[in-house]
Amino acid sequence: MDKTDLQVFIDEHHIQATILPLSEHTLTVGDAARALAVNTDQIIKSLVFHVDGKPLLVINNGLARADRRKLADHLGVGRKKVKFASPDTVFALTGFIVGSMPPFGHKQKLRTLVDTAVTQLDVIYGGGGDVDAMMRLTPDELLKVSQAEVVPFSE
């Protein structure tokens, strides 16, 4: 899948989001912030974990790290049950490669958690479906589309 597929998803679901084509690759938060001339906190990361064998999408912002202990506590499992999914697994579940993955529009709908810090911003930027695209939207729109739980899980 790519930014064209993401745009179709946005259009079909009447989502208030804009895909921004860029002239450079944005594989990291720093790359994306520089390309968009925004603060790193406005860049959201969509990370796939396996929790007790089930996929979970976790969205946090900037350079913040997801605290596996906090995730485990929220989910009622031991910390060792919360593991990062491999890039191949991420692609199989979402249809997008790591570094381009949007927070929604995946091949498979995933249970989603959004860190509370993401909801405190006016505008956020997530993966746009390709390494040379980002998507602009509001936290409210993200929560509406993803049906995410808001949880404080960043370190």
Describe these PLM feature segments.
Residues 1-155:
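Extended, low-hydrophobicity, polar/charged segments
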